[in-house]
Amino acid sequence: MYAIIEASGKQYKVEEGITLFTEKLKDFAEGDQVVFDRVLLLKDDSGVKVGKPYLENVKIVGKVVRHGRGKKIRVVKFRPRKNYHRVKGHKQWFSEVLIEKIEY
């Protein structure tokens, strides 16, 4: 059984027991329980259920394992022959969520 959820403006495929990396969930601390109620699709033994746009009475329950920052990317701005270059770095915040159960 799996579900497609919407979280932080993105769509994720989730199953019970997997670890999901989302954009940082600011309102939740490590160890807090998270409920995703924006479920777009649910596939189980009886078939596929598609929401319009979301399914009612379906929740995904998870637990925030940790918050962290991703790998550093470097953005380079460069002008040839002008001795001009700028380098910026960026590390995106993320939240690691363990999916505990799918309730429907």
Swiss-Prot record:
This is Large ribosomal subunit protein bL21. Belongs to the bacterial ribosomal protein bL21 family. It comes from Kosmotoga olearia (strain ATCC BAA-1733 / DSM 21960 / TBF 19.5.1). It comes from the Bacteria. Disulfide bonds: none annotated. This protein binds to 23S rRNA in the presence of protein L20. The gene is rplU. One of its GO terms (biological process) is translation. PROSITE patterns: RIBOSOMAL_L21 (PS01169). Pfam families: Ribosomal_L21p (PF00829). GO terms for cellular component: cytoplasm; ribonucleoprotein complex; ribosome. The keyword Calcium does not apply. Keywords: Ribonucleoprotein, Ribosomal protein, RNA-binding, rRNA-binding. GO terms for molecular function: rRNA binding; structural constituent of ribosome. Part of the 50S ribosomal subunit. Contacts protein L20. SUPFAM superfamilies: L21p-like (SSF141091).
